[in-house]
């Protein structure tokens, strides 16, 4: 498998992967956008990688992070907000080697840039994502509550 930067030619496949990817059991967030890259453009410094089968060209997954300067207890740190990690349900079952290589590829690139840690958000009902993150060495450090107000 090849880990490489995502390119505009990947857009259609990445949107399809996003639409099929599991999000948990109770809440499904729907984000209708015309380009998979629109979220990455919200940040000034992003890394967006895909895992590509070198024999078939099929995309096995995607990982994305934004490098950010953060102030933690009065000290400036360089962190990376991981805002996407998805496997292609048409190509993968469970935690595959492809997702491992993608995660490691992101880590390597972030360490080269001097990033001290990676952080992200996982919905509490998304047990598969929790499992993947824990297998990769992540640990839960806090909790956020989001509230919605219906408008009708």
Language-model segments: what does each one mean?
Residues 1, 56-62, 80:
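Glycine-rich phosphate/pyrophosphate-binding loop shared by adenosine-nucleotide-utilizing enzymes
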Residues 21, 51-54, 149-151:
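Preference for well-ordered, secondary-structure-rich cores of eukaryotic proteins
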Residues 36-54, 61:
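A short helix-loop-beta-strand connector motif used in the catalytic cores of GNAT acetyltransferases and
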Residues 49, 83, 141-142:
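Core nucleotidyl-transferase/polymerase catalytic module
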Residues 70, 121, 139-152:
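Conserved catalytic-core motifs of GNAT/GCN5-like acyltransferases
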Residues 75-137:
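Acyl-donor binding region in acyl/amide transferases
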